[in-house]
């Protein structure tokens, strides 16, 4: 549950971004989501490294193993000079997440040129994931190194002291989305979280189902369905069911590319890597 203290911290980050000149709430959420996503990639990598150390088993890595690739990790750059952080994120990390393929980030040469990941997938549908489609025109709009440093410090404070699990992260995201409570030009409305939860509990989705939201917005219903399935079936799901869960189970449509981009990242943050998100 989001406490008053957590809301105050989120509001402080929000105010810092507004003071930097970004006043559109949707743009603020979009930029914050990028930063949350970048941080989550490093967290997943740290978990993988910990598992490797305990088991001795080699695992696939998200980040390239070169010095430049490792410099793109949140834990590596977060304490650097703000200007250096800004350069790393704007010139390497952000272009890298836009070109992420199959859970891997591309590397860069010493001259700063991206080394594209070779895609051996024959099926075009598998190449063109929702994440790749809607990140292709994403823009990094955080205006200054100082604003970026405040966002990084604020998010670190939240995650290290207040956000303990996926449920809490979802609540945090829902609180930010609550700032979009007025209808947009295209009639976007945010469904309150308790209504979403009630509807999902009435549906009682199972790991065998296919779930579609024809007006998905930021994928609130799809994420809630995923959380319901996890809480009721996580311990009994087969490998085939987990594979179904990671993508084909969830389909969403919307008319706004920004909302679709937020959907793809929201689902990715909840470990749904290949959803069917489209116009």
Task: Give the location of each predicted region.
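Conserved S-adenosyl-L-methionine
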Residues: 186-279
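Non-catalytic, mostly N-terminal accessory regions of nucleic-acid modification and defense proteins
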Residues: 1-207, 276-279
């Amino acid at each position: 549950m989001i406490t008053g203290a957590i809301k105050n911290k989120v509001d402080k980050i929000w105010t810092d971004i507004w003071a930097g000149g970004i006043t559109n709430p949707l743009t603020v959420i979009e930029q914050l989501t990028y930063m949350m996503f970048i941080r989550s990639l490093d967290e997943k990598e740290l978990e993988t490294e910990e598992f490797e150390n305990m088991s001795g088993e080699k695992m696939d890595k998200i980040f390239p193993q070169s010095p430049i690739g490792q410099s793109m990790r949140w834990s590596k750059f977060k304490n650097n000079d703000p200007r250096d952080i800004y350069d790393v994120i704007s010139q390497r990390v952000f272009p890298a997440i836009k070109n992420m393929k199959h859970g891997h980030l591309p590397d860069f040469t010493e001259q700063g040129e991206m080394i594209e990941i070779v895609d051996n997938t024959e099926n075009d549908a598998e190449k063109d994931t929702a994440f790749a489609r809607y990140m292709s025109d994403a823009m990094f709009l955080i205006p200054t190194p100082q604003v970026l440093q405040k966002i990084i410090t604020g998010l670190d404070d939240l995650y290290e002291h207040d956000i303990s699990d996926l449920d809490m992260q979802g609540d945090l995201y829902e609180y930010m989305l609550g700032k979009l409570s007025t209808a947009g030009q295209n009639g976007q409305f945010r469904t309150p979280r308790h209504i979403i939860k009630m509807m999902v509990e009435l549906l009682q989705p199972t790991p065998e189902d296919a779930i579609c939201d024809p007006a998905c917005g930021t994928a609130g219903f799809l994420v809630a369905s995923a959380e319901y399935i996890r809480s009721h079936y996580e311990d009994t799901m087969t490998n085939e069911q987990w594979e179904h869960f990671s993508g084909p189970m969830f389909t969403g449509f919307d008319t706004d590319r920004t909302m679709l981009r937020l959907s793809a990242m929201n689902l990715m943050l909840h470990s749904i890597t290949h959803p069917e998100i489209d116009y």
